[in-house]
């Protein structure tokens, strides 16, 4: 059911849907990986590939977990849901994840969900049991010619364990799953009606987990979508059952028996994109296992750029172990960019250095090749290769800057290209307004000249070792502590020094 992305199938506006949070607790960094990757893909399509998108996200704000957790905390389920929904979007904002074009709550879509279920009943693919629950009819679905998996749904089995044997025995097939869960009037739920076998059934209950997304996609995006996002754990049964429901709702639109051999086979969702698990020591990070760090906790340790590098530097389809080493890689990537932009922005280029010789030609050609390579990687959403290419481009340019009389124009173009690319990918780097007035430059030139004279003095063989050490200590403290504290970076070479302001920072926006 999952296929590779193909640019040729994407329409003028790509309709996309991502399964959003179930808001009963704070979001963890496993969730962050999913939504940052979705954001990277969405930004790439819109800002780099020039493919407009319309992204919808649902919020599951009524669920057994929400009800259970609200009782534990002594607040209403709605209070708990709104609390964690606000927390989730606050975290997304801090990660610079673009808000979806449409955010839709389950509680605001009950009537749409009921209509969706009713159509499945009308098409003969659902039935009602004595507690007014509605079940998907897998036997009729298979009879109609649709493929059907016999793999067990653990979540459905867990739900059934809470039901009476009488209700379970009314299921036509053990694979039938709940579209609507009937509840006692004393429980949390909604009053709705269904028509089955020409009879009206009043039901108090809540939607089944899978039906929410199918119905809300229909409400917001129509009969079909182009790309459906989610974590790999949603591939089965959630996304699988969504497809069953959509096929049953639209029957016979997506039935292979009703499509001619000459036409392209139509499916409800053209592409599923599943993001791999973020693991702790090989075990999936999850709220139920309590082996996770929340996004809020991690934002106290790393900034949003480092968060984004964290997920860009690995293959997003694969399972990844979350380690200190992974955090170090992300911090190093962030430092590499900041250091490079600072160096270029404050490099003391000479106005006369406008030559374009062999070394400039080599850098220019390498720059062009890397640009083409990065674009190619972005068309395939190979973000880890983009990260490597950025590192390579910075490394190549830094080597060039170490040569005599570098050309400001080409180096500036590389810096501007990287800043523009990173901005489009959702990073927040800002080059601050340089405070390097002529007076500051004059002062720094005097300081550098004084340092040079003192360093020359230390080479005097008549100078005592004790005095030499004191001079070196003063010079080192000045370079390593005092100047960085006021935002100035000083780099000493054998006979001279280079200075620049630390002007590239993560924006506080």
UniProtKB/Swiss-Prot annotation:
Motif extent ('KMSKS' region): 284-288
Pfam families, per the entry: tRNA-synt_1e
Residues bound to ATP: 287
Record's keyword terms, sorted: Aminoacyl-tRNA synthetase, ATP-binding, Ligase, Metal-binding, Nucleotide-binding, Protein biosynthesis, Zinc
Reactions the enzyme catalyzes: tRNA(Cys) + L-cysteine + ATP = L-cysteinyl-tRNA(Cys) + AMP + diphosphate
Annotated cofactor note: Binds 1 zinc ion per subunit.
The protein's name: Cysteine--tRNA ligase
Source organism phylogeny: Viruses, Varidnaviria, Bamfordvirae, Nucleocytoviricota, Megaviricetes
């Amino acid at each position: 059911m999952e296929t590779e992305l193909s640019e040729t199938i994407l329409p003028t506006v790509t309709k996309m849907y991502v399964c959003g949070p179930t808001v009963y607790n704070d979001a963890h960094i496993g969730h962050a990986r999913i939504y940052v990757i979705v954001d990277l893909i969405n930004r790439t399509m819109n800002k780099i590939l020039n493919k407009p998108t319309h992204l919808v996200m649902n919020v599951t704000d009524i669920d057994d977990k929400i009800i259970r957790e609200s009782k534990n905390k002594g607040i209403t389920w709605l209070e708990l849901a709104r609390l964690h929904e606000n927390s989730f979007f606050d975290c997304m904002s801090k990660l610079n994840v673009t808000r979806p074009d449409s955010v839709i709550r389950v509680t605001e879509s009950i009537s749409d969900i009921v209509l969706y279920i009713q159509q499945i009943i009308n098409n003969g693919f659902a039935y009602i049991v004595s507690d007014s629950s509605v079940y998907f009819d897998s036997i009729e679905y298979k009879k109609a010619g649709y493929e059907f998996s016999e793999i067990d749904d653990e979540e459905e089995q867990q739900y059934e364990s809470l039901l009476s044997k009488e209700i379970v025995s009314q299921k036509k097939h053990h694979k039938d799953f709940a579209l609507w869960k009937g509840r006692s009037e004393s429980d949390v739920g909604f009053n709705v009606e269904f028509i089955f076998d020409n009879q009206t059934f009043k039901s108090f209950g809540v939607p089944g987990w899978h039906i929410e997304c199918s119905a809300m996609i229909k409400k917001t995006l129509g009969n079909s979508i182009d790309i459906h996002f989610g974590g790999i754990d949603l591939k089965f049964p959630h996304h699988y059952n969504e497809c069953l429901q959509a096929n049953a709702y639209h029957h016979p639109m997506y039935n292979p028996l009703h499509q001619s051999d000459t036409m392209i086979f139509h499916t409800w969702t053209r592409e599923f994109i599943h993001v791999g698990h973020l693991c702790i020591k090989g075990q999936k990070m999850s709220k139920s296992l309590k082996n996770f760090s929340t996004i809020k906790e991690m934002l106290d340790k790393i900034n949003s750029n480092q968060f984004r590098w964290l997920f860009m530097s690995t293959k997003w389809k694969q399972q990844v172990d979350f380690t200190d080493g992974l955090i170090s890689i992300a911090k190093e990537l962030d430092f590499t960019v900041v250091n490079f932009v600072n160096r270029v922005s404050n490099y003391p280029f000479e106005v006369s250095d406008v030559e374009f010789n062999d070394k400039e030609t080599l850098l220019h050609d390498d720059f062009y090749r890397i640009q083409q390579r990065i674009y190619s990687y972005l068309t395939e959403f190979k973000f880890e290769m983009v990260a490597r290419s950025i590192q390579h481009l910075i490394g190549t340019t830094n080597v060039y800057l170490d040569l005599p009389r570098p050309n400001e124009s080409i180096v500036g173009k590389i810096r501007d290209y990287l800043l523009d690319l990173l901005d489009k990918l959702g990073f927040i780097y800002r080059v601050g307004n340089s405070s390097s007035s002529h007076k500051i430059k004059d002062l720094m030139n005097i300081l550098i000249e004084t340092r040079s004279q003192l360093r020359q003095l230390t080479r005097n063989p008549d100078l005592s070792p004790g005095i030499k050490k004191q001079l070196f200590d003063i010079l080192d403290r000045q370079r390593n502590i005092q100047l960085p504290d006021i935002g100035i970076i000083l780099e000493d070479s054998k006979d001279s020094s280079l200075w620049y302001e630390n002007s590239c920072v993560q924006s506080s926006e």
